[in-house]
Amino acid sequence: MIEKLFILLQHAAPKLALTVFAGFVANAQRGAWTHGLIRWFIRRYGVNMLEAAQPDVTQYASFNEFFTRALRPDARPLAEADFVCPVDGAISQLGRIAGEQIFQAKGHSYSTRALLGGNAELAAQFEDGDFATIYLSPKDYHRIHMPSAGRLRRMVHVPGELFSVNPATARGVPGLFARNERVVCVFDLPAKGDESAKQFALVLVGATIVGSMATTWHGVVNPPRSATVREWHYDAEPVDFAQGQEMGRFLLGSTVVMLWPKDTVHFSQEWLASKPVRLGEKMGDRVFV
């Protein structure tokens, strides 16, 4: 009953107005007031500041500067694996893409085409492939890193809703991740042997009070919030990334969805839905057929 009421409130709430206001507060530089807000947040959510590159709260000029804080260089060593976890969070779902359909929660799925902004050609690459969805909670580190080496080929900003993203909305809002505002980043995988070229996608999904999403090569992608899909291509000047290198961040956080083509990734046996995960842990290895 409580969960149904929460979902109803999600539909009724002025989500964009709340998000704009939250972004204003998060970017405000109010000295002692800002530091008090940060201290409250640390206590409320149990944030481990011992892992932060800058543990002194008074050194953060704004809440967003704290929220997107860097970690100590030794805080997240990379496992020896072809694919490592790109974020701190919890696995929402993972597994095989059934044709175009990605499992969201019991009774709900959404299509790769919808997730990727309606691009049928791009979605076709991931038909019968694999996916993993990771939810970032408020206490988590909110920078996003590369699960493997890759060469950036395109970025797509898809306008959409701003529902909260959590287990309750995953169960109660059909097509949640393909309805919310999102930024799609597509990379080439390094070729190995005679294997044909493959790509993978990292999708940054927005939510209520997620003020914006940013990438390291573009900066803040939203705002501005366009009414239509915007797309950038990098074939002329491709950007190469190493495994574990930072590629983006949430200014207030949400969810990452990863997509791979068929016969590309074999997930670690330890990767299970609802399990907490950390940046750099082994996610899986390449499949060669």
Question: Model-derived features: where do they sit?
Answer:
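Contiguous, well-folded functional domains in the mature portion of proteins
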Residues: M1-V289
